[in-house]
């Protein structure tokens, strides 16, 4: 983007040289031409930012919909067979440990 020539302070503090019939017309015209260029640059920047803002809003909306769709899908639960197999293995281990512990106590 083009750089900005005048700040608001520069415009406020601008003083023109006077000639025989008032201000120097050429100097005033150059200054106003530069002010117009600045306004055109500002308008272009504003339009670009508006377009970017709209694109970001759309992306946010799409991301929000994607997340909500993902959250609504049911999480697959472990199958009951796998759970019962795990429980069965745990019971077998407990049974072996009890035999080891209580079996030794009976012998003593």
Curated annotation (Swiss-Prot):
The organism's place on the tree of life at top rank: Bacteria
A single GO BP: cell division
Entry's localization field: Cytoplasm
Source species: Streptococcus pyogenes serotype M1
Family: Belongs to the GpsB family.
Keyword Disulfide bond among UniProt keywords: no
InterPro entries named among the record's database cross-references: Cell_cycle_GpsB, DivIVA_domain, DivIVA_fam
Coiled coil start-end: 32-69
Subunit organization: Forms polymers through the coiled coil domains. Interacts with PBP1, MreC and EzrA.
Keyword list, A-Z: Cell cycle, Cell division, Cell shape, Coiled coil, Cytoplasm
Record's protein name: Cell cycle protein GpsB
Gene this chain is encoded by: gpsB
Annotated function: Divisome component that associates with the complex late in its assembly, after the Z-ring is formed, and is dependent on DivIC and PBP2B for its recruitment to the divisome. Together with EzrA, is a key component of the system that regulates PBP1 localization during cell cycle progression. Its main role could be the removal of PBP1 from the cell pole after pole maturation is completed. Also contributes to the recruitment of PBP1 to the division complex. Not essential for septum formation.
Gene Ontology, cellular component aspect: cytoplasm
One Pfam family hit: DivIVA
């Amino acid at each position: 983007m083009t750089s900005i020539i005048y700040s608001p302070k520069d415009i406020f503090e601008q003083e023109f040289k006077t000639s025989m019939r008032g201000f120097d017309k050429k100097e005033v015209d150059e200054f106003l031409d530069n002010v117009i260029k600045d306004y055109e640059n500002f308008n272009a920047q504003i339009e670009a930012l508006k377009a970017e803002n709209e694109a970001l809003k759309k992306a946010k909306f799409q991301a929000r919909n994607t997340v909500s769709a993902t959250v609504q899908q049911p999480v697959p639960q472990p199958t009951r067979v796998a759970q019962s197999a795990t429980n069965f293995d745990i019971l077998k281990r407990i049974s072996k440990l009890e035999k080891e512990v209580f079996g030794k106590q009976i012998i003593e």
